[in-house]
Amino acid sequence: MSTDEERIYSIALTQIPGVGHIGAKRLVDGMGSATDVFRYRTELPDRLPGVNRAVVAALDSPQALKRAEQEYEFARNNRISCFTLADEDYPSRLRECDDAPVVLFFKGKANLNALHIINMVGTRNATDYGKHICVSFLQELQMQCPDVLVVSGLAYGIDINAHRSALSVELPTVGVLAHGLDRIYPSLHRKTAIDMLRQGGLLTEFLSGTNPDKHNFISRNRIVAGISDATIVVESAAKGGSLITADIAGSYHRDCFAFPGRINDEYSKGCNRLIRDNKASLLLSAEDLVHAMGWNIPATFSGKVNVQRSLFPDLSEEEQKIVSILEK
């Protein structure tokens, strides 16, 4: 569990120029905490090969610490959780990634370490076909795997339809933002975002006041991929942000799936190519996903045990003990 000091130093580390996502995580992992990265910064070149003097000099930054203190105060005043790599509530799947954020801001009720987590992404120009997939797929998934958490990016198109479809079947859903938690972008999705706070939440690595600039969306996509067991591309043109998310998921060695479409449909070309190039598995139903991920194994095993017991309804107490031992 992090202290307030560790949270402030973790935020400050994100404000140091020239460090980057991979560098920041490497520093924290190598020193054991963001606090020690700053406290023992002059020792970094000796303790962590590859760290240069420019980074050491940049870490001597009262401005970064002041900005971090302001942001932490903003988070506390607005009941925003601040998770560092040391926190149990930090997404464990994301922590495994080399470029995981050293700090995350979260508002909501979802468990970011839920047993099963998927993300659903796709084009901002969702067709009726894509919208129907979001609804029907999550309806079916809710019946087969009711504990799944649905992640997306709150953007136009497939993203917002995935969130709304999850809400409609009472699945928790988390939106990963490309800006701070002082705003909702696009503003048209504010009502859905508010609903998500009661049944999911909003997550970001960005400080308040950060604009939703183009490069932030790529950073956002790595969180979407890294927090999930599986990435599902619903619809995509030949080029698009969801294909970047799929590539990132592949680099993390996470499962990726795509729904196929007609070969001449503009917003199925990306999905069809992912499947053709073996970058994604073909997905036709929620049952396909549950089977591919092995999420149905415990239930199947349990069913076999129940069948075995029903074959021997009149066992003695001693015989029942033997059966119980064999089941273990």
PLM regions and their residue ranges:
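Glycine-biased, small-residue-rich flexible motifs in mid-sequence functional cores and linkers
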Residues: S2-D4, T84-K328
